[in-house]
Regions:
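Sec-dependent N-terminal signal peptides
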Residues: 4-16
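Mature extracytoplasmic domains of secretory-pathway proteins
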Residues: 56-123
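C-terminal partner/receptor-binding element of secreted or periplasmic proteins
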Residues: 133-175
Length: 175
């Protein structure tokens, strides 16, 4: 009886862990996961289209949230490839859009100044809400939740800017 109870308890603990685990195969086979920046990059980003949602918007600020899988590729420097399942919130200040910046007379006359202005501040910020780590087979390695909201700037040349643009396009229909 004690053995049966122990087995039942073990099954109750192991089955939920397996349901939440995500493997590389599962990510690639799910049609909701859209690959962003594949190729020679050390990390491929997959955005779960079904998780994209508008969080908040006002006249100048837009926020969108989504699950992004950061998958380390074989050409990475690390020995063990990993998968991060990251819940992110992007914040975009519309005052930093190209159209808004062009309304400023100094930038409308000299496009090189416009480029410098966009490089200085893309208008996009990012915060990480939670992270779950897995190996390629789907074995859970760690879980970090309830991360305090702390936005960091996303530069134009950062791959996360491309990911953020995709999320905003899906959430709001524009980039």
């Amino acid at each position: 009886m004690k053995k049966l109870f122990s087995m039942l308890l073990l099954v109750c603990i192991v089955i939920p862990l397996q349901i939440q685990a995500i493997s590389m195969e599962a990510i690639k086979n799910d049609k909701n996961n859209v690959p962003i920046l594949t190729g020679k990059n050390a990390i491929t980003y997959f955005v779960d289209k079904s998780s994209i949602k508008r969080v908040e918007e006002n006249e100048f600020i837009y926020k969108a949230q989504a699950v992004v899988y950061e998958v380390e590729n074989n050409n990475s420097r690390r020995t063990n490839s990993y998968i991060h399942k990251v819940l992110v919130t992007y914040r975009y200040d519309i005052n930093h859009s190209v159209a808004s910046v062009l309304r400023t007379p100094q930038y409308a006359q000299d496009y090189s100044l416009l480029i410098y202005a966009k490089q200085a501040s893309s208008g996009m910020k990012l915060t990480i809400n939670s992270v779950e780590d897995f190996n390629y087979e789907g074995v859970a390695l760690g879980n970090f939740g309830n991360i305090p909201e702390q936005y960091v700037d996303v530069a134009l040349h950062d791959p996360k800017y491309v990911v953020g643009n995709y999320i905003f396009k899906e959430a709001y229909g524009t980039t």
